Each structure stands twice: as structure tokens, then as C-alpha cells.
Amino acid sequence: MATTTFLSNATINITQGATTTDLSDQANACTITIGVDPLESTAFGDTGHRFTGGLQTVDVAITFFLSYGAAEVEAILASCVGLGTTILTISPSGTSETATNPEYVLTNCMLANFTPINSTVGELATVEASFTGGTWVRDVTP
């Protein structure tokens, strides 16, 4: 069976309010975990547990290089803390969505906290932002 090698080059757009910012060039790692809450639907007479899908679950972890300024990583993340209205638009490679490059739109995510200063002598300052909650849609239409 043939395999495909995938070189990641994710696009990461963060929208808060009416402002969308492309932070792809400020990140070096991104993980999206999607799912649904399992709701037990076991009934009398069943011989094992049964489940049905409940509310969607979303967890996103992004590692950013810290930068400071009016429209930079620190200011953008600070504006997202605690609001629960952030929209993340992420695709694995490039901006054109296709079956081989699905775009995930994560709506009403919350950034509960982040570390605005994370400095070590001789190293690039990075921060991991963890967004949770909201809903997700997978888009493959160009």
C-alpha cells in the first residue's frame, strides 16, 4: 500500500470580535482534538453498556512564539482570555480547503488562561495556548 508523506504547514487564524489575525508565522505546533460527550443510553434488557453522542467537545493546543505589540501574539491572546467567543480557523497546509486539506472552524472556544511572559536566557520565548469548548465544523469545499 502506498503511503503519503505529509509536511505540515498549518494555517492558524484567530478571530475575536470583528478582528481576524493570521498567526501561522508565529506558531510551530498545533493539535486539535474533537469529539462528542458520550451519553449512556443503556436500557433494561441490554447485556452491555450503550452510548449515544451528546454535545460536541473541542480542545486545541497551539505553541506560539511570544511577540509583543499591538497586533502580536501576546496582545491577541490576552484579548481572548475568558471570553468564550473566540473563533479558530485551522487547516493542515495552506488556505485552500480540499478533501486532502480539511479546514476546521472552531466557534466559541475559550482560552481560560495563558502565560504572557515565559523567558529563558538564550531561548526563544514560547507559550502554549489551550482553547476549549465551543463547536466544530470540518470543511472540505474550496
Identify the function of each model-found stretch.
Residues 1-142:
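Signature of extracytoplasmic/envelope-associated structural regions
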